[in-house]
Amino acid sequence: IRCVSCGEEYDDDEVIYTCEKCGSVLELVNEIDVSKDIFDGRKDNLWKFKECIPVDESKIVSLDEGGTPFCKCDKLGDELGVNLYVKVEGSNPTGSFKDRGMTVGMTKAMELGVSTVGCASTGNTSASLSAYAARAGLRCIVFLPSGKVALGKLAQAMFHGAEVMSINGNFDEALEAMTALALEKHLYLYL
């Protein structure tokens, strides 16, 4: 894990959200050397490429995300002069592209041995986190800005057993409150 601003490096076995030196965003640096032939014949989901994802393979938490269909976009493709396809990410388990990152994040949470995960969300993240936490058997706490979340997404979080708390304010205020809780109670925060 490396800071995008100052280059400070951190081990991937510690829970850290921003650079302790300068406060900037962190990035995962993953240098891999695998033959693409190993992916042939595997089930078409995100974990088809497990060698490219730096986690303990025995801890994988999956709902069979990824492998979503392609949709050909003839009109726009013709206009741009290209053969254009888009992915139908609504085919993921919770109906969002967020599931792709969540499977990796939840797998990392299991690898780190955490018991509680949390997020601030306006919908898709809370739905995804709660589904993956339920699959992993982890406690899930979700902070939502009051009145700013689609009922379907709220229902998904509750259906999966998340502890949902409404925060008076906007998303940024919900995130600030969740970050404070995560630091105080040592829960794994999904950003």
How would you name each of these model-derived features?
Residues 1-191:
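PLP-dependent amino-acid enzyme catalytic core
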